[in-house]
Amino acid sequence: MYKLVLMRHGESQWNLENRFTGWTDVDLTEVGREQARRAGELLKREGYTFDLAYASVLKRAIRTLWIALDAMDAMYTPVGLNWRLNERHYGQLQGLNKAETAAKYGDEQVLIWRRAYAIAPEPLDIDDPRHPRFDSRYAKIPAEQLPATECLRDTVARVLPFWNESIAPAIRAGRRVLVAAHGNSLRALIKHLDNISDDAIVELNIPTGQPLVYELDENLRPIRHYYLGDAAEIEAAMAAVAAQGKAKKD
């Protein structure tokens, strides 16, 4: 049996402000840093050790990983960073407040933009300074691979090559792997692992800073999965994620 641990980054500044973040490189809040520290302490207390860790190239995931590894006294763990683990790109929605956008366009439309499997928001213009082609961290990525917007289907197509070419081979080689990434890039991995339908994946809510353990068979199919930590706290965190895209009630 193999084990894989997935962890969404801790609360970011734009999580706190309820903004569409996507590929915008915002940092963790103090709460997010504490979530990462507690996650690392929990992993250490439960006896987890890792041979290899992966994160996206966005600082909220990288910092979450480093804080967690530091709390585990495991800063020596080899780390691989890859853009394919980035959050879903939200196009022109990036930077907008989710509740304000819901008040303007309706909860249903915002839910579609946030979660619909095959519907992407309006793309960034190719000359928009927010376009990833202007970011030096993506300089070696072919321009045609860099998104100006994504639906979840696009995110799955981006993430799965990294699973197939890097994460899965490492697990099959017996390496214990930790992945620190984002709500939608982790949703893409979970959809693949659990064979979740396009419709059902919309309902999956992943809380920040909570280690999610997958026990996998020899074919890397899930035997079971579970969050570490307090069940009530995790349920409350999931509910908070689900409520992010709703208009505020007077």
Curated annotation (Swiss-Prot):
Keywords: Gluconeogenesis, Glycolysis, Isomerase. The record marks 182 as: Transition state stabilizer. InterPro entries: His_Pase_superF_clade-1 (IPR013078), His_PPase_superfam (IPR029033), PG/BPGM_mutase_AS (IPR001345), Phosphogly_mut1 (IPR005952). Substrate binds at residues 8-15, 21-22, 60, 87-90, 98, 114-115, 183-184. It catalyses: (2R)-2-phosphoglycerate = (2R)-3-phosphoglycerate. GO terms for biological process: gluconeogenesis; glycolytic process. Catalyzes the interconversion of 2-phosphoglycerate and 3-phosphoglycerate. Homodimer. This is 2,3-bisphosphoglycerate-dependent phosphoglycerate mutase.
